[in-house]
């Protein structure tokens, strides 16, 4: 797993209180990991802070899974 993926996974585990093994590439934040809309906003803010990037609202709406987050952040960093 890449450094970006490790850091994203740590944020997801901390913010959603889920087990690490539940955070898989295709795991949906809402459907699989129990996040609500506020959780997803907080995750995006945490990703922005951790990686020093800005995630526009239209892009944030496309980040639905762990894999989506890793891909977006990898390309933006």
From Swiss-Prot:
GO CC terms in record: cytosol; membrane
Organism superkingdom: Bacteria
Modified residues (O-(pantetheine 4'-phosphoryl)serine): 37
Keyword field contains Coiled coil: no
Location of this chain's protein in the cell: Cytoplasm
Keyword annotations: Cytoplasm, Fatty acid biosynthesis, Fatty acid metabolism, Lipid biosynthesis, Lipid metabolism, Phosphopantetheine, Phosphoprotein
A single GO BP: lipid A biosynthetic process
Pfam family, one: PP-binding
Pathway assignment: Lipid metabolism; fatty acid biosynthesis
PTM info: 4'-phosphopantetheine is transferred from CoA to a specific serine of apo-ACP by AcpS. This modification is essential for activity because fatty acids are bound in thioester linkage to the sulfhydryl of the prosthetic group.
Keyword Phosphoprotein: yes
UniProt GO MF annotations: acyl binding; acyl carrier activity
Carrier domain residues: 2-77
Function: Carrier of the growing fatty acid chain in fatty acid biosynthesis.
Family named by the database record: Belongs to the acyl carrier protein (ACP) family.
Protein name: Acyl carrier protein
Gene it is expressed from: acpP
């Amino acid at each position: 797993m890449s450094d970006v993926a490790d850091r994203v996974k740590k944020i997801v585990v901390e913010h959603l209180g889920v087990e690490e093994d539940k955070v898989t590439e295709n795991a949906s934040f809402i459907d699989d990991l129990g996040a609500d809309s506020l959780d997803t906003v907080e995750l995006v803010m945490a990703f922005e802070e951790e990686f020093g990037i800005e995630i526009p609202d239209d892009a944030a709406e496309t980040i639905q899974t762990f894999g989506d987050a890793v891909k977006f952040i990898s390309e933006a960093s």
